[in-house]
Amino acid sequence: MYVARLSTRPLSNPSTAQLSKAAAFFAQSYALPSTKCTAHVPSRRPFTSGAKIQVKGRDLFPEPXHGQIKRTEPAWPHPPYSVEQMRSKVYFAHRKPRDFSDRVALGMVRFLRWCTDFATGYKHNVEAPKTASDSNAVTATKPYQMSERKWLIRYVFLESVAGVPGMVAGMLRHLRSLRGLKRDNGWIETLLEEAYNERMHLLTFLKMYEPGLFMRTMILGAQGVFFNSFFLCYLFSPKTCHRFVGYLEEEAVLTYTLSIQDLENGHLPKWADPNFKAPDLAIEYWGMPEGHRSMRDLLYYIRADEAKHREVNHTLGNLKQDEDPNPFVSVYGKEVADKPGKGIESLRPLGWEREEVI
């Protein structure tokens, strides 16, 4: 067996000085404290070696400095949500499967949920929602094991893959429109906007938490597997894929409902601190008003987004994929009082039936 031969000669004074300068530069760049070497205690934190960077630390994506460009406006401005709408119209709801396609989609979501819970070490003190219309639809039955850090681990991982379905579906419909030499009837824009919105969720949480190397590797693998799997499935059955995303967003609404309840019940004291504010990126994107910029308010905004995605995908799963227009960007007559749109004024948790919108 080949073994590399190492030199045992002591370093010269110039070499020692160079190593000292390099170590000092590294410590200064990453804001490391200047202390003596101590025994390393292995971390028991699952899935990540990251650290919270809300107030102090290294910004993962600082604002670039350009000479003439002052700011870049979002490609899809976020529709306004009122506080009353987010708290009264958004709640956990489950659409019961009606055919084999729905059951396949629901089964895949439940399997994915189990895999994600196992990978992120997610454990909560609940069993099941009480009722579909209860915004606090949980019952505590187990010892509480979550924390702010564990919630951020879950948020970052989930949002890193949540933006995949909209991008894949929009890309495939775009390519089909090109090769078919026909219009898409407004689906592409809504799907790409959904992917953009999920990415903004991820960027918001990355302003509060920096994932470690292991988590980055897991995200890379999960994205590769999920992208290719969803790509192939959408080629064969786009209806099943939209139903899958609808059920996936049901789980997202439940996840954020649980975290909001934890915060309101005092289990997450760091986020309940009045000095803990939402990142500037989130305040600008959602247009969060003064007095409603806390972590609790941020979770309400994100949960409302997930509820909107749930409505959109359950609705798209009810339509004829090749010929029906997208009802969320369509213009209806004045005689139609209740109609879908980009906001949550007429939110339907289980989606719109085809007969209601076409």
UniProtKB/Swiss-Prot annotation:
Enzyme class name: oxidoreductase
Molecular-function annotations in GO: alternative oxidase activity; metal ion binding
Gene Ontology cellular-component terms listed: mitochondrial inner membrane
Main location as per UniProt: mitochondrion
One of the protein's GO biological processes: alternative respiration
Superkingdom in the source lineage: Eukaryota
Known EC number: 1.-.-.-
Residues that hold Fe cation 1 according to the record: 159, 198, 201, 306
Family membership noted in the UniProt record: Belongs to the alternative oxidase family.
Role description: Catalyzes cyanide-resistant oxygen consumption. May increase respiration when the cytochrome respiratory pathway is restricted, or in response to low temperatures.
Protein's name according to its UniProt entry: Alternative oxidase, mitochondrial
Organism: Monilinia fructicola (Brown rot fungus)
Gene that this sequence comes from: AOX1
